[in-house]
């Protein structure tokens, strides 16, 4: 069963102790030196914000500041096997451009609330 996270209510079904579906296709997530699945787990564990993806195979972009101060983005595709219980990460990248600006603005708005 596959799942799409178009409905925000679906996020409540994620197993946050083991959030990712990883197989041979996405086992080598990082295209940037020094980034790996552990970095994606850091993003998931550090109060991420979610943004709808505009293009490509990802439905959502999970963004968070990780230990060390870097802001990383993990594109998420629908699960191939686990329905709504797992997210399927398809990369780990440093956040940049408009996405980084939106994340920093949204975090600032949260701290002002």
Language model features with spans:
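Ribonuclease/tRNase effector modules and their secretory precursors
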Residues: 1-113
């Amino acid at each position: 069963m596959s799942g799409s996270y178009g409905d925000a209510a679906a996020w409540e079904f994620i197993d946050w102790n083991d959030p990712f579906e990883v197989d041979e296709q996405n086992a080598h997530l990082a295209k940037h030196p020094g980034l790996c699945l552990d970095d994606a787990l850091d993003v998931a564990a550090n109060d991420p914000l979610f943004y709808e993806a505009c293009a490509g195979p990802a439905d959502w972009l999970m963004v968070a500041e990780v230990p060390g101060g870097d802001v990383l983005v993990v594109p998420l595709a629908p699960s191939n096997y686990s329905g709504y219980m797992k997210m399927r990460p398809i990369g780990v990248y440093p956040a940049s451009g408009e996405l980084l600006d939106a994340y920093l603005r949204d975090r600032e708005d949260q701290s002002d609330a």
